[in-house]
Amino acid sequence: MKYELDKTDGHARRGRLKFERGVVETPAFMPVGTYGTVKGMTPEEVEATGAQILLGNTFHLWLRPGQEIMKLHGDLHDFMQWKGPILTDSGGFQVFSLGAMRKIKEEGVHFRNPINGEKIFLSPEKSMEIQYDLGSDIVMIFDECTPYPSDWDYAKNSMEMSLRWAKRSRQRFDELNNKNALFGIIQGGVYEDLRDISVKGLVEIGFDGYAVGGLAVGEPKEDMHRILEHVCPQIPADKPRYLMGVGKPEDLVEGVRRGIDMFDCVMPTRNARNGHLFVTNGVIKIRNAKHRSDTSTLDEHCDCYTCKNYSRAYLHHLDRCNEILGARLNTIHNLRYYQRLMAEIRQAIDESRFEDFVHEFYERIGKPVPPLNSSASKCD
């Protein structure tokens, strides 16, 4: 992987990630394909929304179908027939989500398989081996996602263990002679001094990119923004920055305002299945009765297959009847909305008018523009 930074506009960055499998224009949003599929979508349909890179889930693909089945096909790209790059998370967040079902120790995490209850073990080394077999274009280190709220002592111990796991991840990645990219994950909760230690330690180890982890786990938006403003300037400018598990359209805009290049989230696909659709001026709940006889298109500014062919009334009908097609059409639209938003962001940076775009975006959705700490160092 090669990262090229073309230009900056304030803190916002415009660039691209170059892989053997293709080019990803940044800032970029990655649809989530947890089990080797973006729910309800073929790879061709996902590509048609404008997506250039997908996210797969190491933890879930390890449990089902498993490494051996994957290797029978070649790798995850061959298994799911996605031709572009794939980033896989390490399994750390899924382990964190298991709660009382898991025991975190220095060597790794012991837990019970949520599918069949058997005892299994996941370590930094094992995560690197699984992701190697998946053929991931971007591999994420194995870390502990520090929960919120956590006191300073817990966050410190968690961050320090994640740093030790980062070294072990790097070592095993290199032993496997993996030629793809490896990203470090910055932890430390909402504590700036701990984030400082994490960034410094990861940069000393050396990675191809750096993710900001442990955010969007329940903390106030002000804390997320504060941590991003504090951490971003410390990440090497020639490396991509990835905000994990984020988020709403506003979160993408605010992340870019603070120097983030990459995002992923289940929100556009999950919300689509629940009838919550993103449009130019906000969100539409398509199952609401007011859409029952609405013959207008979902979003007149959208060029997706759904908007070009179907009315709000039809989408309302499908949703009320729990028809699978409704979930598919909604997903096509929401993913296209996210990709159009990222394209608008990239164009605004190209034209040196990103902050004007930010104000236009918030005016469209009827929300105030969050403050930006202008005293923070620029991320360029």
Swiss-Prot record:
Gene Ontology terms: cellular component: cytosol
GO biological process: queuosine biosynthetic process; tRNA wobble guanine modification; tRNA-guanine transglycosylation
Reactions mediated catalytically: 7-aminomethyl-7-carbaguanine + guanosine(34) in tRNA = 7-aminomethyl-7-carbaguanosine(34) in tRNA + guanine
Binding note for cofactor: Binds 1 zinc ion per subunit.
Keyword Methyltransferase carried by entry: no
Disulfide-linked positions: none
This protein's UniProt keywords: Glycosyltransferase, Metal-binding, Queuosine biosynthesis, Transferase, tRNA processing, Zinc
Subunit structure: Homodimer. Within each dimer, one monomer is responsible for RNA recognition and catalysis, while the other monomer binds to the replacement base PreQ1.
Protein name: Queuine tRNA-ribosyltransferase
Gene assigned in the entry: tgt
